[in-house]
Amino acid sequence: MFSASSAVVALLLTATSRVLAQDVETTPTPVGCETLLQRREWRTLADSEKLDYINAVKCLQSLPPLDPTLTAAQSRFDEFHALHLEKADLVHVTGEFLPWHRYYVKLYEDALRNECGYAGANPYWAWEQDADSASSISGSPVFDPVTGFGGNGGPGTYSLPPDTDITANRIDPDAFVGCVQDGPFKDYTLRYGPGQLVTDHCLTRNIRDDSAQFLDSKAMAEATQLPTYEEFRIELEGEPITPTHKMHDGGHYGVGGEMSNFYSSPGDPLFYLHHSNLDRVWRMWQLMLPDRLYEISGRSTVDPPYVNVTLDYPLDMGNLAATIPIRDVMDIWSPPNCYTYV
């Protein structure tokens, strides 16, 4: 039976789709951007475009690091991975969670384009399309062994290092079922993780369908109807390593393995598609009311003492890029972003 609550969710879904359509269809090229890169959903890309993106990621994994003094880093991809390990405690469950990751993914996109000749934009994985279906998430095109990122881990093909402190490293042992068995990254060696460990190991996964409830269109609609940035951010992000999962944690745990880890999740290239979709949901929320474009709030750290996050709060990207204030990344139609979602 179609309930009143179902009707509300349906209306919210219609509203969010209309807002996202407006992002491209009714907006002229913004001042300051020569053009807008169009971030598209993975399954809408032609096979050749998917392979171009995968090859660009593999290129980044083969380029030497810009900072030769960075411990264990052997590639530009490693440099991005290492920064997340360093900053994770500061950029999760805080007000800067969304703007920090927006800038982080943008820098990754820039590296793919400027250093590896990639002509497109960073794609996103609209996991709500997979969560809404009756099929397993493992059937998503992002897990295709040829035109995707490979599938599941093989049981028993990976073991955590002896004496690993799973609490300090926020590791869920059940998520690390084994090494990815197919696809373009099955033989790639990660230098960082799990957690804050520095160890050479394979890319691991344990794809789980029980996370679908946090990734469906209903969850997205419920988040975007919240009135304040802080309420929206909490509903989208959730709390790490607790039963209170939301879209952010649901995507990480749905993939499992390295992606499930609070610190080392960017070791899985799917991280950047997952966070592009989270950024897209934030963009939906921003566009619903004019005052939301520059609305920011929240604490600067999980534990006191902390300050309130404001538009002037610095986004520290370590050796990847200059530190800039949050206000500079709030509008994706302005530099340094200059992209949109289609």
Where are the predicted features?
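Fungal secretory targeting signals
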Residues: 1-23
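Intrinsically disordered, flexible peripheral segments
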Residues: 20-342
